[in-house]
Structure formats: structure tokens, C-alpha cells
Amino acid sequence: MGQARDRVNYSFKRLKEIPEELRPREKLLKLGPENLSDEELLAVILGSGSKGADVLSLSKELIKMGWEELEKKSVEELLKVRGLGLVKALQVKALVELSKRFKGGKSRISIRNPQEAFEFLKDKFDERRESLIALYLDLSNRLLDWEVVAIGNVNTVFSKPKDILFKAVKLSANGIIIAHNHPQGEPSPSNEDLNFTERLKKACELLGFELLDHLILSEGRYFSFREEGVL
């Protein structure tokens, strides 16, 4: 048996103990984000620790809590974490919220007028058949979610108000925009379109939602019920 060797410690507890080239920012620059641990990525975002806690120790403590727990905690509760001051608590809450908004690829974009609704919707339809899409917005007209509510044939699509309102209740939405396409023909409303819109508007009012608009899209153009004074 050879001479006993000093034990090699791969786990550095404090940032200042880590060789400069292996610190989170330097690693990110040299190796890319995919080669950093969760703690290291959070340390890059937080930037520095405090007198009471090194940034890596602080990041490790926060990651250990888990994303769902961080989402639930208020700023006041986060301030109880050793070394986490007000600015960093706000950074954590902002990061969690931003991550939630981008989860699933659905960023919280704003839709404030018919043109913005059209720009969002124009590539969402199958040109071969009619479809009905619903957009669900919050009080600030930010998109909470959207879905294809119904798919029909080349000339018609059938739906009921409850098909749209069920998800609005689930999301606690404030406003709803519906849209459907006319694969063949002009983007102008039929009698069926007018009747359905009126029924949906009344159903929305009963449940405390606002029907913001109904758009009909066809061949790169649109008809807005709100813009034309029909709604």
C-alpha cells in the first residue's frame, strides 16, 4: 500500500474557494449554460451573495426548496431565507414568474386591438377547413392561453358557448376573443356568425366575462365585430 493521499474535495462550499475559471460566470462564458448546474445558473442571475451567505450557498438553498415552493412563497416569506435581501427576493419572484409565462411556449403577450389579434391568429388556422379559436386574456389584455375550440369542414364549424366558457372559468380570465376562418369566401359574417356571437356575448355577461371581439379571417384579411360596431 502506498502513502496515504490527501482527500480531493470536488465540492466547494464558497465562491471564493473555487478557482476563477470554474466560477459560474466564467463557466457560462466558456462552456455554455447547458454545462452549469441549477445552483450555478441561479448564482449567475443573482450575481452576488450577502454578508450572511455566499451566492452559491444561497442559490443551493433556493434550488433545494423546489420551483413550486418558490412560486407559492411571497416576498415576505422569501426574506426569511438567510442571506436573501429584498432586491434578491424580488429577483427570484420575477424569475419564477417569467419562467411560468414561458412554460409551454406561451409567452404572456398583449393583445390590445383587432390588428394585434389578427397578427397572432393569422397562422393558427388550417386553410382547408373552418376552425374556431378562443383567446383568453387577463385584466391587462395579456394572453393567458388560447385553444382551438372546434374544427368543422370547408364551410361550417359548430360550437356552443359552454365550450369556450369552461376554460375561461378555469383560467379566471377577464376577456375573451374568438376567431374563425372562412377558407373559401370573404371575411364577412353570416347570419349564423351573428347569432352565435350574440348568444356568446350574453353567456359571457352572465358569468362576468367580457367578449372583446370576434374576428373572421380569410386570405390575409380580417373582419372585426368590434371594429365594425357589430359587437
UniProtKB/Swiss-Prot annotation:
Q: Name one GO molecular function term.
A: metal ion binding
Provide the GO biological process annotations: proteolysis
PANTHER family for the chain: DNA REPAIR PROTEIN RADC (PTHR30471), UPF0758 PROTEIN YEES-RELATED (PTHR30471:SF3)
The record's similarity note reads: Belongs to the UPF0758 family.
> Mind telling me what this protein is named?
UPF0758 protein aq_1610
Q: Which residues form a coiled coil?
A: none
The UniProt record gives the binding positions of Zn(2+) as 180, 182, 193
Q: Which organism is it from?
A: Aquifex aeolicus (strain VF5)
Where is the signal peptide, in residue numbers? none
